[in-house]
C-alpha cells in the first residue's frame, strides 16, 4: 500500500522559530533558563508535591464538548489524540501513540494500548470514535474542525479517520478536542458536567464549577505517574491578587500574567517564566452590525488605532508591530502592515458623511457613530487605549468589561460589536485549519462573520495542498485579502510572559509551557 509522508513543517519554519527566540530580550532568556532543572534540584517530600494554580480561566464544566470546559487539557484532566509542539511544527503523542496517512484522505491511528477512562472502561478505538462523533455533533467549536470526517474502529486500538478531502494537517485540528467516555455522557446527562469520565493523568477530587478544581494522580493512567501529588486550581480574576498570592507563597503558578504585573514579577527576580509563543493581538469586528459591514468604517477604525502608542507604551517591551494574521517573521506571514493614520481616518469619515457632533462623536442622519467594545482581563488596558484613540477620530466607545470565562459564550452568541477577544493568530502546523476558523464563511470561530468568496476558495485550495512552498504562498494570499478587507484589526505581535512559576517549580515541558504536565515537581527548600 502506498504511504504518504505525514506533513511536518520544514527546516525553514524551524529556523524562523529559532531566530524569533534568539531575538527575545536577554532577561527573558535568563529567566527562562532559571526554570530548567539542575543537578542539585532534589524533589521535596511527597506531602509537599502540591502545585496551586491561580488563573482567570476556570472550567465551568468538565464535559469536553462544553464551550466553558476551560483548561481541562492544560491541567491534565483531559487528553486529545495528540498535542502540538510550541513552535507548531510537530505533533506529540497523547491518546494516539502513532499515526500514518495511508491515503490522501485516510489516516490510520494506533491508540495507547493500556489507556483507560477514570471509570476503568477501556479507551479503545470504538470509544474514541464515539467521542469524536459526539464532538462533531454537539461541540460548536469542533464541528467545523471535524466537518466531513468519518471515524471507524478498524481494530481494538486502531482508529481510521476518513476526511472529505485531502488534508495533510488534519491531526493538528484535534489538539484541543478532549477524548471522553461518550457512552457515559449520554447515560448521565447533565451530571456529566460535574462527573465526567475522562482519561487525564490527574483526576478531580473536588470541583466547584468556575471556582475551584482539585486533582490527584489517576493511578490507572497509561503514561508516567505525575510527580505532583495534588494540584489545586482556583479562579482569581484580579491580576494583582494573583501576583500577591505568588509573592506570599500562597500559589506556585500564575496562569495569566497580565501586562501590568509583568514588570513587578521581573523586579522581584525570583520567578520563572517558561517561554510561550508569540501571537498576533487582533480586534474582532462584528459584520452583522450594519455600520461595521461598511468597509469604509472598518478602514477608518483601523487607521485610527495608534499602534506606535500601544506597542511602545501599553505593551512595552513585550510587543512589536503586527503585519497580518500570523506573527511577523514566520515563513508564511506577510510583511505588509495595517497603517495608523488618524488624520486620514477623520478625512475618510468626513467623506462618508459622518460629521462631529457637539460632544465630538460623529453623527450622520441622526445616528451616532458609536460602538460597545467587549473586553476583559489582560486586554483591558489596551482596550482603554483604543477607546481614547477612537474618540480622537470621532467614534464613541463604551467598554463592556466581563470575566474571561463569560466572554466565550458572548462571542459564540455573536452578542458583541467590537471585541478584544483573545482568539489570536500563532505559529501552527495547520495553516488551513487556523485560517479557516478565522475567515471562512459560516465557520463558528469566525466570530465576526466575515465573508469573501475569493478567500473561501483559497482556503479550500489550501486544505489539500501537500507542497510546503505552495501552502505558504496560499496562506500569504489569504492574509493579503483579509487585511485589505479589514476583516480584523491587527494591533501587535506580543511575546507575553503568560505564565509565572514559583522558584521551587521544576520540570515544565518546553513544548507545553501553559500546561501542568507529569514531569513537573516541587524542589526541596
Predicted features by range, described:
Residues 218-264, 387-388, 396-404:
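Ligand-site clamp/hinge motif
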Residues 97-138, 160, 291-293:
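Aromatic- and charge-enriched surface segment that lines or borders ligand/interaction sites
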Residues 100, 143-185, 206:
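Surface-exposed binding/hinge segments that line
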Residues 42, 208, 212, 304-337, ...:
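Detector for C-terminal structural segments
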Residues 124-131, 156-160, 200-201, 228-230, ...:
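Alpha-helical secondary-structure segments
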Residues 54-103, 110, 130-133, 197-199:
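N-terminal lobe/hinge region of extracytoplasmic solute-binding protein
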Residues 55-72, 94-97, 121, 169-178, ...:
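A structural "hinge/loop" feature
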Residues 85-86, 174-226, 230, 238-240, ...:
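Gly/Pro-rich hinge or "lid" segments in bacterial periplasmic/extracellular proteins
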Amino acid at each position: 500500500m502506498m504511504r504518504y509522508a505525514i506533513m511536518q513543517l520544514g527546516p525553514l519554519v524551524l529556523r524562523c522559530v529559532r531566530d524569533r527566540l534568539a531575538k527575545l530580550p536577554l532577561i527573558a532568556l535568563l529567566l527562562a533558563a532559571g526554570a530548567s532543572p539542575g543537578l542539585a534540584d532534589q524533589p521535596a517530600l511527597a506531602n509537599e508535591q502540591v502545585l496551586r494554580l491561580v488563573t482567570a480561566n476556570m472550567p465551568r464544566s468538565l464535559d469536553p464538548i462544553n464551550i466553558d470546559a476551560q483548561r481541562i487539557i492544560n491541567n491534565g484532566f483531559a487528553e486529545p489524540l495528540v498535542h502540538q509542539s510550541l513552535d507548531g511544527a510537530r505533533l506529540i503523542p497523547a491518546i494516539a501513540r502513532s499515526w500514518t496517512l495511508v491515503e490522501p484522505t485516510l489516516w490510520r491511528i494506533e491508540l495507547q494500548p493500556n489507556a483507560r477512562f477514570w471509570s476503568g472502561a477501556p479507551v479503545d478505538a470504538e470509544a474514541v470514535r464515539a467521542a469524536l462523533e459526539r464532538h462533531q455533533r454537539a461541540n460548536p467549536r469542533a464541528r467545523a474542525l471535524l466537518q466531513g470526517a468519518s471515524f471507524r474502529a478498524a481494530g481494538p486500538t486502531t482508529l481510521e479517520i476518513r476526511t472529505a478531502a485531502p488534508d495533510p494537517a488534519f491531526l493538528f485540528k484535534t489538539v484541543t478536542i478532549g477524548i471522553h467516555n461518550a457512552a457515559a455522557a449520554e447515560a448521565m446527562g447533565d451530571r456529566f458536567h460535574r462527573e465526567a469520565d475522562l482519561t487525564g493523568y490527574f483526576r478531580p477530587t473536588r470541583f466547584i464549577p468556575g471556582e475551584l478544581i482539585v486533582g490527584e494522580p489517576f493511578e490507572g493512567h497509561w503514561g508516567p505517574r505525575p510527580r505532583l501529588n495534588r494540584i489545586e486550581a482556583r479562579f482569581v480574576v484580579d491580576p494583582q491578587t494573583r501576583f500577591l498570592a505568588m509573592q506570599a507563597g500562597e500559589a506556585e503558578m500564575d496562569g495569566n500574567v497580565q501586562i501590568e504585573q509583568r514588570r513587578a514579577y521581573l523586579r522581584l527576580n525570583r520567578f520563572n517564566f517558561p517561554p510561550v509563543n508569540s501571537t498576533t493581538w487582533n480586534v474582532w469586528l462584528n459584520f452583522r452590525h450594519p455600520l461595521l459591514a461598511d468597509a469604509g468604517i472598518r478602514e477608518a477604525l483601523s487607521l485610527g488605532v495608534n499602534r506606535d502608542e500601544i506597542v511602545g507604551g501599553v505593551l512595552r517591551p513585550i510587543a512589536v508591530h503586527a503585519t497580518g494574521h500570523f506573527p511577523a517573521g514566520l515563513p508564511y506571514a506577510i510583511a505588509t502592515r495595517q497603517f495608523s493614520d488618524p488624520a486620514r481616518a477623520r478625512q475618510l469619515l468626513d467623506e462618508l458623511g459622518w460629521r462631529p457632533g457637539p460632544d465630538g462623536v460623529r453623527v450622520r442622519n441622526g445616528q451616532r457613530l458609536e460602538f460597545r467594545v467587549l473586553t476583559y482581563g489582560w486586554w483591558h488596558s489596551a482596550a482603554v487605549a483604543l477607546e481614547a484613540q477612537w474618540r480622537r477620530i470621532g467614534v464613541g466607545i463604551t467598554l463592556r468589561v466581563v470575566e474571561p470565562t463569560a466572554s466565550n459564550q458572548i462571542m459564540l452568541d455573536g452578542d458583541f460589536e467590537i471585541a478584544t477577544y483573545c482568539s489570536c493568530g500563532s505559529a501552527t502546523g495547520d495553516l488551513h485549519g487556523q485560517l479557516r476558523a478565522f475567515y471562512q464563511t459560516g465557520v463558528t470561530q469566525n466570530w465576526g462573520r466575515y465573508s469573501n468568496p475569493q478567500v473561501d476558495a483559497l482556503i479550500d485550495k489550501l486544505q489539500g495542498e501537500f507542497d510546503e512552498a505552495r501552502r505558504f504562498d496560499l496562506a500569504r494570499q489569504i492574509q493579503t485579502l483579509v487585511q485589505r478587507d479589514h476583516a480584523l484589526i491587527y494591533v501587535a505581535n506580543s511575546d507575553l510572559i503568560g505564565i509565572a512559576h514559583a522558584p521551587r517549580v521544576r520540570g515544565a515541558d518546553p513544548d507545553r509551557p501553559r500546561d501542568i504536565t507529569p514531569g513537573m515537581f516541587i524542589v526541596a527548600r
